[in-house]
Amino acid sequence: MAEPTPAGWPSAPELTPAPGTPSEAAPPQDNWVYWAMLPPPPPPLSSPVAGTEPCQKEQPHVEPQPTSGAFPPFDAQILPAAQPPFDAQAPPDGQSQFNDQQAWNFQASTPWYWGLSPNGFPTYNTSFHSPATHSYFPQSYANYNDFNLPQNRKQKKKKRKEPVFHFFCDTCDRGFKNQEKYDIHMSEHKKCPEVDCSFSAHEKIVQFHWRNMHAPGMKKIKLDTPEDIARWREERRKNYPTLANIERKKLLQLEKEKRGEVLTTTQYGKMKGMSRHSQMAKIRSPGKHYKWKSGGARQRAVLGLGNRARDLKPEIPTKVNVDPLGVLIHSDSESDKDEKSQRAIVPKEVTPALCSLMSSYGNVSGSESEPEEAPIKTEAEVLAENRVLPSSPPKSPRHNVRTTARTVLRAKWKAQRSGLRKITLKQKKSPCHPLFEPRTRHPHLLEMLLAPDIRHERNVILQCVRYIIKKDFFGLTAGSVKTEDV
């Protein structure tokens, strides 16, 4: 009895075995799994009589498969269709497979079959699962594909053997393997063109030697003879800071101060303010370079009073007995060059074009420390007053001078008050001002070259001043005593 088929599936057709040999019997009809697995039956024979010799010759001879109980021979070829499916059950011992009938022996059109893998799961073997014989990588990557990997990927590079030299030229720092090459190199040596120099080497090395030793501006140190070496060592011993040398330098310094030679040559080469380390130190420790003040109102008042006093009155020393030598020593060496010229006020008769030109020149020549808004506002106010006043009749020159002075003072006072009111956000956030302002002017080349001569001239002037004070050449001491008594 046939097994029931699922709904929608066609029923298995009844297979009628063709007349022939017993080995060509069809499988039983009661198992539809075998019907699904087996290919269609072969076409019917053309000859009327089955089993004749011509018909048997046309069919290829296929060896019958052994029964289920016996093992196939060692050299027998097992066809894929002859293997049982993975869900087939072995027949009982007493009953032969397929009711004592063997299955069809055929060669499948496609080389697929169901087989059992070692782990128990079915594998579907097809022709494209054949072992790879060709690499899909280009030929340039042949050493890096999966089929041609080197045994040791990290192949160490072979160390090059260092050449062995038997002849050396110490001056040129070169080595040679044989005597011939060494002789050729020594024949190329040339002597230094200087008269007192005995240096000899290759032409290029001689050029470097001349640039480093004999070029103009280079210090000439001759250490060729033992006498020169001994003299050089003696000079170095004199300058070495031993205790005796330190005491000797102190005595020389005291003698110079007594004579009046106080000034020393400025070391222009150090440039302490421009170095990177000093700038970084200022950034890291701002407290050392800034002077803090408490109270913004007090600071405004102090600044306002100071500016007003500076504008109204020139600085006059309060002390009567002032040492001129001390004033010269503590004064800046460049004070005569850096004196700031006072701002000229535009007269009333000047045309507007000339006024703008002079105001622009005044802005350029003005000091950098003062705010830029104050002088501009002052000049604008003065010009406005000068434009209004020409309609009035001219007065005496003294009266004009007084009026201009008053207007200038009023304008400056107003500008200072307005400038103090306008405080920037930076000044509000940081109530500090730099204690040491950076130097805006750098020394010129001529000044640096003439530094020793300038020092000598100023020391001579200081010596003259010291002599005048000690000898009371002008009678200043007697006059000062009389004024004190009065």
Swiss-Prot record:
Zinc finger map (C2H2-type): 167-189
UniProt motif Bipartite nuclear localization signal: location:
236-252
GO biological process terms, alphabetically, are:
box C/D snoRNP assembly; positive regulation of transcription by RNA polymerase II
Q: Where is this region: Disordered?
A: 1-71
Species this chain originates from? Rattus norvegicus (Rat)
Query: What keywords are annotated for this sequence in UniProt?
Result: Metal-binding, Nucleus, Phosphoprotein, RNA-binding, Zinc, Zinc-finger
Give the GO cellular component terms, alphabetically: fibrillar center; nuclear matrix; nucleus; perichromatin fibrils; pre-snoRNP complex; presynaptic active zone; protein-containing complex; synapse
User: What is the protein's given name?
Assistant: FMR1-interacting protein NUFIP1
Cystine bridges:
none
Phosphoserine PTM positions read: S331, S333, S335, S396
Known InterPro entries for this protein?
NUFIP1-like, NUFIP1_cons_dom, Znf_C2H2_type
Give the record's subunit note: Interacts with FMR1. Interacts with ZNHIT3. Interacts with NOP2, NOP56 and RUVBL1.
